[in-house]
UniProtKB/Swiss-Prot annotation:
Residues 2-174 are annotated as: Pre-S. The chain crosses the membrane at residues 182-202, 254-274, 349-369, 376-398. It comes from the Viruses. This is Large envelope protein. A lipid is attached at G2 (N-myristoyl glycine). Isoform M is N-terminally acetylated by host at a ratio of 90%, and N-glycosylated by host at the pre-S2 region. Systematic vaccination of individuals at risk of exposure to the virus has been the main method of controlling the morbidity and mortality associated with hepatitis B. The first hepatitis B vaccine was manufactured by the purification and inactivation of HBsAg obtained from the plasma of chronic hepatitis B virus carriers. The vaccine is now produced by recombinant DNA techniques and expression of the S isoform in yeast cells. The pre-S region do not seem to induce strong enough antigenic response. It comes from Hepatitis B virus genotype F2 subtype adw4q (isolate Senegal/9203). Residues 2-181, 275-348, 399-400 are virion surface. Residues 2-119 are annotated as: Pre-S1. Residues 84-110 are annotated as: Disordered. The gene is S. The large envelope protein is synthesized with the pre-S region at the cytosolic side of the endoplasmic reticulum and, hence will be within the virion after budding. Therefore the pre-S region is not N-glycosylated. Later a post-translational translocation of N-terminal pre-S and TM1 domains occur in about 50% of proteins at the virion surface. These molecules change their topology by an unknown mechanism, resulting in exposure of pre-S region at virion surface. Residues 120-174 are annotated as: Pre-S2. Keywords: Acetylation, Caveolin-mediated endocytosis of virus by host, Fusion of virus membrane with host endosomal membrane, Fusion of virus membrane with host membrane, Glycoprotein, Host-virus interaction, Lipoprotein, Membrane, Myristate, Transmembrane, Transmembrane helix, Viral attachment to host cell, Viral envelope protein, Viral penetration into host cytoplasm, Virion, Virus endocytosis by host, Virus entry into host cell.
């Protein structure tokens, strides 16, 4: 049956030992196992098989695009089974529905002079004559109006119902102003929330700095071991409520909050004293207190509309009233300085030292620069928690 198998053939297409059931390898159609042709089971030498070059002419068939077997035994011998595409003529587009139903195009409207000739006769002369009728006049002009000059248009129901205060024909509301009016408070709220979140981090940062002063080698790990509720290792500045060190952390942060409130109060007093809103009577020269009595009253107010006095009357030992002017700025600071100078005489030497430092301004500036260069990084790490307070202080200083 067939040619002898002992003949030596080379190449992948001449190797009969390679199974080729579907004929996708070169010079093979079907393996003899399928027995497609009983007269010649050796399909490598079957003369009835289709030639291999014809197998290259494949197209869209039963196996999808470009995946059609090169024979027709499985799918048939039709052009579709062999992958040959047949182009069918496309059907013409359907005609318009209006044309099929017999509808004609809409005719062009005739001019107004043909359809409504009476409207063309209504010229300005007829209009002014019609205005002589009170009923027609009331439709175009409000009460008390005239037909000459600029007129207010007749109010409409829409304008009356929409806005009582606005007139018909008035300018429309500017949406840009409305948008800016809404975005302004939103920007302020965003800035306040940002500063609030930064301020809330101040106690934690100061707590870490405070704790680091006790442990120069770095913050230790809090074991947090408790007989009732053991916890994992953590920093002493972030103790959970179950840790024994939690109460000490709360105490430290409470003291830090009091310190921040004291700092804000001092800043507020300095600001009010700078603006002259703290009218404090100064001390008399040579005395430590101002005498009490009916003479210690303000005799003159400050210039302008200010509600703060400008001077105070004091009664010294000789019995004569003396009017002492109140400084327009730093009244409380000068009072405290005079009171401290009267109590501590060595403060007068400090004034001379400050004046001497001011006289040596280049040297002082070099000293300050050297101190900042040497202690600057440490100062920045210490003062960094207070940076969120600076914008608030600057805003209050400018606004008040």
């Amino acid at each position: 049956m067939g040619a002898p198998l002992s003949t030596t053939r080379r190449g992948m297409g001449q190797n009969l030992s390679v199974p080729n059931p579907l004929g996708f390898l070169p010079d093979h159609q079907l393996d003899p196992l399928f027995r497609a042709n009983s007269s010649s089971p050796d399909w490598d030498f079957n003369t009835n098989k289709d030639s291999w070059p014809m197998a290259n002419k494949v197209g869209v068939g039963g196996y999808g695009p470009g995946f059609t077997p090169p024979h027709g035994g499985l799918l048939g011998w039709s052009p579709q089974a062999q992958g040959v595409l047949t182009t069918l003529p496309a059907d013409p587009p359907p005609a318009s529905t209006n044309r099929l139903s017999g509808r004609k195009p809409t005719q062009v409207s005739p001019p107004l002079r043909d359809t409504h000739p009476q409207a063309m006769q209504w010229n300005s002369t007829h209009f002014h004559q019609a205005l002589l009728d009170p009923r027609v006049r009331a439709l175009y002009f409000p009460a008390g109006g005239s037909s000459s000059g600029t007129q207010n248009p007749a109010p409409t129901i829409a304008s009356l119902t929409s806005s009582i205060s606005s007139k018909t024909g008035g300018p429309a509301m500017n949406m840009e102003n409305i948008t800016s009016g809404l975005l302004g408070p939103l920007r302020v709220l965003q800035a306040v929330c940002f500063l609030l979140t930064k301020i809330l981090t101040i106690p934690q940062s100061l707590d870490s700095w405070w704790t680091s002063l006790n442990f120069l080698g770095g913050l230790p790990r809090c074991p947090g071991q408790n007989s009732q509720s053991p916890t994992s290792n953590h920093l002493p500045t972030s103790c959970p409520p179950t840790c024994p060190g939690y109460r000490w952390m709360c105490l430290r942060r409470f003291i830090i909050f009091l310190f921040i409130l004291l700092l804000c109060l001092i800043f507020l007093l300095v600001l009010l004293d700078y603006q002259g809103m703290l009218p404090v009577c100064p001390l008399l020269p040579g005395s430590t207190t101002t005498s009490t009595g009916p003479c210690k009253t303000c005799t003159a107010l400050a210039q302008g509309t200010s509600m703060f006095p400008s001077c105070c009357c004091s009664k010294p030992s000789d019995g004569n009233c003396t009017c002492i002017p109140i400084p327009s700025s730093w009244a409380l600071g000068k009072y405290l300085w005079e009171w401290a100078s009267a109590r501590f005489s060595w403060l007068s030497l400090l004034v001379q030292f400050v004046q001497w430092c001011v006289g040596l301004s280049p040297t002082v500036w070099l000293l300050v620069i050297w101190m900042i260069w040497y202690w600057g990084p440490n100062l920045c790490s210490i003062l960094s928690p207070f940076i969120p307070l600076l914008p608030i202080f600057c805003y209050l200083w400018v606004s008040i």
